Amino acid sequence: MPGSAKGSIVDGPDGQPVGSRHIAQAFANEKYFQPRPSAVDYNAAGSGGSNLGASNPKLRERVVETLKGRTEASVPADAVTTSGSGLDPHITRANADGQRDRVEAAWAKQLDPAKVKTEVTAALDAATFRPLGGLVGGDPLVNVLELNLDLTKRLAGR
């Protein structure tokens, strides 16, 4: 795994480090895809999952809050649940597809909507992979940081 001994740091368009491909981070800008919710507020020093059980009203409140802004009929579980570490850098392709309209609308405020749609599709397709090359099944995944950096290169770098 090249780079893993150095933390798998990913550089942004300016060559400066922007994150690690193995640790989720929040993206505040509506132009970007969002990772799974984090029980530890994306704090890599204190990783951990939520201990809220299915019968806990606080879990329901958090899920309801997270669902705001999602318009698809069936929201993927990873859009509203935390991972065991709270730092999973991947989301399912279904989760990413559910965020598409918001991301495309945000970029289309400044750029041609048709171009935005084409570039978002290309970025999603390039970022999508299956764990272990699809040998064991599982949902297609997307690395959120790498997807957002590709979007920046495709849409803001022009």
Q: Model regions: which residues?
A:
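Flexible, solvent-exposed loop/hinge segments and secondary-structure transition points
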Residues: M1-Q99, V103-A106, R130-P131, L135
